[in-house]
Amino acid sequence: MIRNALLVLVFVLIGTISAATDADMTTDSGKQPSNINQLTLVSPEGKRLLRQGSVKEGGVHDATEERAFIVTPLKNSLYRILAAFGLKPQTLYVQLGIRTGMANALYNRLYHSYHRWYATYGPRVYG
């Protein structure tokens, strides 16, 4: 029961993080809107163009910048909570139905992100 509630909380926060990441990419492109409320008015096509513009202007982008999105403080704290409750990536893999191929992209993204975090920062077992 607690695990299901925790999974719902994680899904809600992952959606929030995705929206915040898009807003950060929009503001990082150097073409900031005059009003903070205008961020919601930027279409997905406009966001894509802003991202492309920031990549062209920025120069060299290494893999650490791409991976920086999984080490945000909110995700890090959520993954620590999941690890503290004993939820392993394999548990998510089974519970979310990823092994059956019926899971949507959000579940796959959550699983892969948590799996990478768990491999890097999760509890170490030496036996």
From Swiss-Prot:
The question of whether Translocase is a record keyword is answered with no
The record's keywords, sorted A to Z, are:
Secreted, Signal, Virulence
List the subcellular locations: Secreted; Host cell
Keyword Plastid among UniProt keywords: no
What induces or represses expression of this protein, per its UniProt record?
Answer: Expression is induced during host plant infection.
From which residue to which does the signal peptide run? 1-19
Sequence motif RxLR-dEER, location on chain:
48-67
Give the record's GO CC terms: extracellular region; host cell
> Which residues does UniProt call coiled coil?
none
Described function: Effector that is involved in host plant infection. Contributes to virulence during the early infection stage, by inhibiting plant defense responses induced by both PAMP-triggered immunity (PTI) and effector-triggered immunity (ETI).
- Domain statement: The RxLR-dEER motif acts to carry the protein into the host cell cytoplasm through binding to cell surface phosphatidylinositol-3-phosphate.
Q: Which family does it belong to?
A: Belongs to the RxLR effector family.
This protein is called what? RxLR effector protein CRE6
Q: What organism is listed for this UniProt entry?
A: Phytophthora infestans (strain T30-4)
- What gene is this protein translated from? CRE6
